[in-house]
Amino acid sequence: MEINIIAVGKIKTGYIDEGIAEFLKRLQPYTKVNINEIADEKVPTNPSKAEQEIVKKKEGERILASLTERTYVIALDVKGKPMTSTGLAKSIKNLQIQGNSSITFIIGGALGLGKEVLNKADFRLSMSHMTFTHQMARLIILEQVYRAFKIIHGEPYHL
């Protein structure tokens, strides 16, 4: 199983970078993880709905261009389906059983994901009813993927 993360924007905070590096290291025995950073668009101050849609469309085009053909796409979306850590582990295990060798998590930019990306997703996952920065979302999803693999392997999870 290969885990891909497509994320809009760069990590600009050292402690988040350190956390990401730690979970990438912890995931090595379980799965290969690829992170693809997509350039973010500059968001105007107080953007109109039309300007917001333009930003999401441009970022979405870059996201869609970087998707591989044979991957199960999970879009992180505040309006998506919430899932427990155990539920995520079961979903990953079921995808493996069904023959999926690749899962791609997509993390949008400051304005979220455009409809083209959401429509391409096989599943929309909500990590919380709260909104996180794309930087925090990247760290949190890596932690949850690590936790899922520990659950799948019947191993205790302790930080």
Regions flagged by a language model, labelled:
Residues 115-159:
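Structured adenosyl-cofactor binding patch, chiefly the S-adenosyl-L-methionine
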Residues 1-27:
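N-terminal beta1-alpha1 ligand-phosphate binding loop
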Residues 6, 34-36:
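General small-molecule cofactor/ligand-binding pocket signal
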Residues 31, 70-71, 121:
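Short, well-ordered alpha-helix to beta-strand connector turns
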Residues 97-106, 128-134:
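Short, acidic/small-residue loops that bind anionic groups at enzyme active sites
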